[in-house]
């Protein structure tokens, strides 16, 4: 009777920033003959392209919202219930290792794995480690980060940390093979406006006004592809219709990697996944970090790309139609600068991260190369 290949359980929060790196690692592990499953919350089913429903286990979890006794009790109850379910999963599936990618849905499976002595690893894509991963960091077997130096201030954590980069989905790797072509003097200028997998209202508030300020000389050149929440769709469409723009609006783009590859300039939030994908593909960007985050992780993420020369970072308080119009106008008049930004961003990217992380996972799980080929 042929032995089954080892199972690697991947745990990720239900947004694209957590899920897409898990998908990329899943592809790399499956190519090595390993089995994979995903533990997450219900949101992930919308974004996942790799994991079919029968490869996904949904466990209850709760993001901590507020410090009131009621909020704390609700979070504790949900996470406790999720951990009991995760313990049952560990008993039934017996994974060789459990790998977390951040977000509160990773807590139950990682804690359950630790209770059973199953090897564990967390991967963090941010320049500042997220709260769930930080909570788990002292408990897990190993840590992987996208950027160097994230945990240098804690020698105990630094000793078990490996810098791998952010794993990229096959669609991103395909988009990275498309070279950047600067816009011609009178040719189309392709703008891509996104706000993360959950959208961003600030883009609907600011971008239409900025484009209107660019004036009629530039409007005919613009090709605007914008992610817009359903509740903001009508007002954004009304502005672009009035300006007679060439535009496309959607609440979510399933083919975002191809859209990134086709763009001359990306206007976006600066979640870790977005920044890593922009660097991998090499596209100029204007990044607007999400304000109010406890750790200012998006501000730090955007700083990595802006310091490399691949992006312009604008704090949300400064992100006005006038400021954005000035930046777009200056870039539209200077194609050579767009080319330089694309090259600088690409220089900050890493395309082999999924394989590097897969190497680490196999090592942590104690899987031999011979064992990993079992089906």
From Swiss-Prot:
One of its GO terms (molecular function) is undecaprenyldiphospho-muramoylpentapeptide beta-N-acetylglucosaminyltransferase activity. It catalyses: di-trans,octa-cis-undecaprenyl diphospho-N-acetyl-alpha-D-muramoyl-L-alanyl-D-glutamyl-meso-2,6-diaminopimeloyl-D-alanyl-D-alanine + UDP-N-acetyl-alpha-D-glucosamine = di-trans,octa-cis-undecaprenyl diphospho-[N-acetyl-alpha-D-glucosaminyl-(1->4)]-N-acetyl-alpha-D-muramoyl-L-alanyl-D-glutamyl-meso-2,6-diaminopimeloyl-D-alanyl-D-alanine + UDP + H(+). CDD domains: GT28_MurG. One of its GO terms (biological process) is regulation of cell shape. Pathway: Cell wall biogenesis; peptidoglycan biosynthesis. One of its GO terms (cellular component) is plasma membrane. It is an enzyme of class 2 (transferase). UDP-N-acetyl-alpha-D-glucosamine binds at residues 15-17, 126, 169, 197, 298. It is found in: Cell inner membrane. It is a peripheral membrane protein. Its EC number is 2.4.1.227. PANTHER family: GLYCOSYLTRANSFERASE, UDP-N-ACETYLGLUCOSAMINE--N-ACETYLMURAMYL-(PENTAPEPTIDE) PYROPHOSPHORYL-UNDECAPRENOL N-ACETYLGLUCOSAMINE TRANSFERASE 1. Belongs to the glycosyltransferase 28 family. MurG subfamily. This is UDP-N-acetylglucosamine--N-acetylmuramyl-(pentapeptide) pyrophosphoryl-undecaprenol N-acetylglucosamine transferase. It comes from Rhodopseudomonas palustris (strain BisB18). The lineage of its organism: Bacteria, Pseudomonadati, Pseudomonadota, Alphaproteobacteria, Hyphomicrobiales. The gene is murG.
């Amino acid at each position: 009777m042929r032995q089954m290949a080892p199972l690697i359980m991947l745990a990720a929060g239900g947004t694209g920033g957590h899920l897409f790196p898990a998908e990329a690692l899943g592809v790399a592990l499956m190519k090595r003959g390993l089995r994979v499953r995903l533990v997450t919350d219900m949101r992930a089913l919308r974004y996942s392209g790799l994991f079919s429903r029968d490869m996904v286990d949904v466990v209850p979890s709760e993001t901590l919202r507020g410090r009131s006794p009621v909020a704390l009790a609700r979070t504790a109850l949900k996470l406790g219930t999720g951990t009991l379910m995760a313990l049952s999963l560990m008993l039934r599936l017996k994974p060789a290792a459990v790998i977390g990618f951040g977000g509160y849905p990773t807590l139950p499976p990682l804690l359950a794995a630790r209770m059973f002595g199953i090897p564990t690893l967390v991967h963090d894509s941010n320049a500042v480690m997220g709260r769930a991963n930080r909570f788990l960091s002292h408990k897990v077997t190993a840590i992987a980060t996208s950027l160097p130096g994230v945990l240098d201030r804690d020698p105990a954590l630094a000793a078990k940390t490996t810098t791998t980069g952010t794993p990229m989905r096959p669609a991103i790797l395909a988009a990275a093979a498309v070279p950047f072509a600067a816009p011609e003097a009178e040719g189309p200028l392709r703008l891509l406006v996104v706000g993360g997998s959950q959208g961003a209202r600030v883009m609907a508030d600011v971008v239409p006004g900025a484009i209107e300020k660019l004036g009629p000389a530039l409007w005919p050149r613009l090709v605007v592809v914008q992610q817009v929440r359903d509740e903001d769709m009508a007002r954004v469409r009304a502005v672009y219709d009035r300006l007679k723009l060439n535009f496309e609006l959607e609440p979510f783009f399933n083919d975002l990697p191809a859209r990134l590859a086709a763009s001359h300039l990306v206007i976006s939030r600066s979640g870790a996944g977005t920044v890593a994908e922009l660097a991998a593909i090499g596209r100029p960007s204007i990044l607007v970090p999400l304000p109010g985050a406890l750790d200012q992780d998006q501000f730090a993420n955007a700083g990595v790309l802006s310091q490399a020369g691949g992006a312009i970072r604008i704090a949300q308080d400064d992100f006005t139609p006038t400021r954005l119009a000035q930046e777009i106008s200056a870039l539209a008049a200077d194609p050579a600068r767009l080319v330089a930004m694309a090259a600088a961003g690409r220089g900050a990217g890493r395309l082999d991260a999924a394989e590097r992380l897969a190497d680490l996972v196999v090592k942590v799980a104690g899987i031999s190369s011979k064992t990993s080929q079992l089906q």
